[in-house]
């Protein structure tokens, strides 16, 4: 998920939810080809994240193979090829879900990437470009024959975006033709959703995306439900705010090419520009940690004007103090 599943988010999810395969934000192969520093930063991996797949996108087999080799060198456990992004700026380059309209190029990309690396190669795709053709089954067969070791299907068509409900029956149809592990994706928000998807489709696992934005505890609940363990209690307001603080601090560190905020504090170097970039990129995400709480909309409005970590922490701490003051005494 672009600008969401960065290292800070992934580390928080891993700490809260425990074992599970995660993927980076998608990485533009063409940007890597031209040496974009910001894009290289997306491929950095922290040891606590593993296993971790680096997801790449592009429309040229040779450039995709080159990027896959770099991702492997940077420590990826899996190379995942994105053929599901429906956003126009991606599709107009012949990348992402646009490849659903060009199965020959899509297959050539999979072959090129598989031939370029030793790590497993996986593919994430949508059901098809539009309702006129459920393209995924035939394409998945070609991908597995080309060497892909896992397929993830988001059970919507590209033209849908995120509109309507995911059609899990499409995953069941895919199960009939795909012999490699098949992962279902789309509208899994609760433990009950995950179990229903597994039981109704025969898929081998579930991928959760949007449900974890601002609520990484959803992953812990879903995992517990799938494993038959007790469902964890909902986090306290204090825990959610502390997690938002950790998220912000780790993301500032990432923009400074460090793992922990304390590392950059010790150097004494000026990190104000990196801090500004990091905090601005989190303006829409951090308020989601307290979504639904009284006064959350006011907090969101204030954070949208923040440029520094100190400003964010002051707003969150002030909000927590206000909420504590309203609690009954005794």
Describe each region flagged by the PLM.
Residues 1, 27-29, 57-59, 84-86, ...:
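Active-site beta-loop-alpha junctions enriched in small/polar residues
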Residues 1-77:
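Glycine-rich, positively charged N-terminal anion/phosphate-binding segment
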Residues 2, 8, 108, 116-118, ...:
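Alpha/beta catalytic cores of nucleotide-metabolism and tRNA/nucleoside-modifying enzymes
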Residues 11-17, 65-79, 83-95, 103-180:
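Alpha/beta enzyme core
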Residues 22-24, 52-56, 79, 121-125, ...:
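Hydrophobic faces of well-ordered beta-strands that scaffold small-molecule active sites
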Residues 35-39, 102, 153, 167, ...:
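Short, solvent-exposed helix-helix connector turns and helix-capping sites enriched
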Residues 39-41, 94-100:
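Short glycine-enriched, charge-decorated loop/helix-capping segments at active-site entrances
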Residues 59, 101, 307:
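Residue-level signal for the nucleotide or nucleotide-sugar donor/cofactor binding architecture
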